[in-house]
Amino acid sequence: MRKLNVLSVLILMLSIWMPLTVEAQMPTLSNKNKSDWWHPIGIKPYQSSKKGIGFISVKGNKFVDENGKEIVFKGLSISDPDKLKKDGKWSKKHFEVIKSWGANIVRIPVHPISVQQRGIEEYLTLLDQAVSWSEELGLYLIIDWHSIGNLRTELLASDAYNTTKKETFSFWQTIAAHYKDVPTVAFYELFNEPTIYDGKYGTCTWGEWKLMMEELIDVVYAYNKKAIPLVAGFNWAYDLTPVKDHPIAREGIGYVVHPYPGKRKIPREPKWEVDFGFVADKYPVVATELGYMNEGDDENLLNDGVYGPSIVKYFDQKGISWVVWVFDPVWVPQMIKNWDYEPTEQGAFFKDVFQGKFKYK
């Protein structure tokens, strides 16, 4: 009888806790507010109602489609869906305009504060809409955990970027489970811009960062082996020099760089090659942010008249995919002047590149 009681208790415990171990995810607001918290509400997988585009995978230093054909991505970042929703501009039209410009990929920056305020369930509703629209339009997506700073010490650049290692891992656990077998959501940019900011955010070695990213990639792959994790280097996602001797020890990934004009002086190409370009000879590289403007307070973004043409030519030579920041009339450097989608100077330039009007030679 005693053995039976012990067995019954074990079965009861398993029935209570099994959903949490099998369907691990970010804490949901509804569960926090539920009186019967021992019956958790799980986040269900995304259900596509459309036959979308095929899966992307890594082959050597290239991204390839299901037929093995190389794809070089050229696209843009939108602003955070939470901002767009509050602006009254979150709609399929936004993605239709992007498609009409000629982009083949959209980067979605997810700020920790927007998930914290809105809650993961409601935020996933926004992402699901983006996925549905992108499926219809034939666009691929990068989901970007848009934090800046040192994840090891959890010292971040501002309240908008504040997160923890646990929250970061839980976010990707949720995304990987929710969008498993969804080819449109091709890339997971694990952490936007790692930096120790000259020690102001504490210390973190490349070895420590490498181990953390490898652990996070393992979590992603446990849920979704078809995802392509993207890993950034230090110095606000600019410096990939440690990859030469100590690459991320996981297959199927890509590397991230944010080569804004202020990072290097003219001539930039030899320095780009040393800082990140060499990585593209062996692994896929995506410049998930780049861009410029003619005036403003941020010297890192200021145009010198040659940056745009020189960087797209360099990417073309190296086979590097790229994504321009940012398709918003307020966030800088802007690609559009207003919500009539009138392009700025950089917007017009990159639109021409998307549409094949730029002459590389």
Segments from the language model and where they lie:
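Bacterial N-terminal signal peptides that target proteins for export
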Residues: M1-S8
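Bacterial N-terminal signal peptides
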Residues: S8-P19
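N-terminal carbohydrate-binding accessory modules
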Residues: A24-I105, F234, V353-K357
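Extracellular glycoside hydrolase catalytic/binding regions
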Residues: F55, D87, D159-A160, K166-F187, ...
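Acidic/histidine-rich helix-loop elements
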Residues: N67, I71-K93, V115-R118, L156-A160, ...
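Active-site loop signature of alpha/beta-hydrolase-fold enzymes
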Residues: S79-P81, I113, I148, E193, ...
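An active-site-proximal structural segment forming one wall of the substrate-binding cleft
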Residues: D87-I105, Q116-S147, T153-F187, W209-V219
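NAD(P)H-binding glycine-rich loop region in Rossmannoid oxidoreductase-like domains
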Residues: I108
